[in-house]
Amino acid sequence: WVRGFDEVDLLYCDSVAHVGWIKDIVRRKSVYRVTDCLAGFQKTTPVALELEKELAGSVDLVVYAARSLEDYVKQLMPKSMAYLPNAVNYAHFGQQSCARPPEYDAIPGPIALYVGAMDVWFDYRLLDEAAARLPEISFVLIGPDALAKQRLRARPNLHLLGKREYRELPRYLQHADVGLIPFDVANHSELVRSIHPLKLYEYFACG
């Protein structure tokens, strides 16, 4: 199923779904990147955990994105491991004077913005309470929001804009007043404490 690759210099894997690559692709070196504690996701199966261990033990190097993942990676028993934190594409997110998003014309400021996935580990209760207590602030969410629509009450200062293209994100961030990372530490501590959010650097780059 893999065509056009007699041999690759570096085989980069970032999902347990890539374990088949290790068996099928000839490579000089291979890397598996761990960005989250897979065991912390509710839907992770025992089979997925076994596949991750197999993948981690097969590659030349396992890199992990957060210091808090070090012990988790150690128990995967890799041949070699190294800390490689997230970083921002500054050329993209640090660009100056992006045009104001047209949606913001109908949203009064100040704007508190979240950009990213909204899954079970998102703290919907906290966000709902913040929106209720701070009616003068507009809370804007960008990203796949099917679950958010189920769990958040409709409020005049809560705006779910849905998914936006990656190329458009800097302007939404630049014209917001504060960036949010409302993750549910109380109920998903293992997962949340292992996260080193890329969005944090994107927020910083946009000022």
Report each predicted region and the residues it spans:
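Nucleotide-activated donor-binding/catalytic signature segment of Leloir-type glycosyltransferases, i.e.
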Residues: 148-178
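Active-site proximal beta-strand in glycosyltransferases
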Residues: 12, 23-39
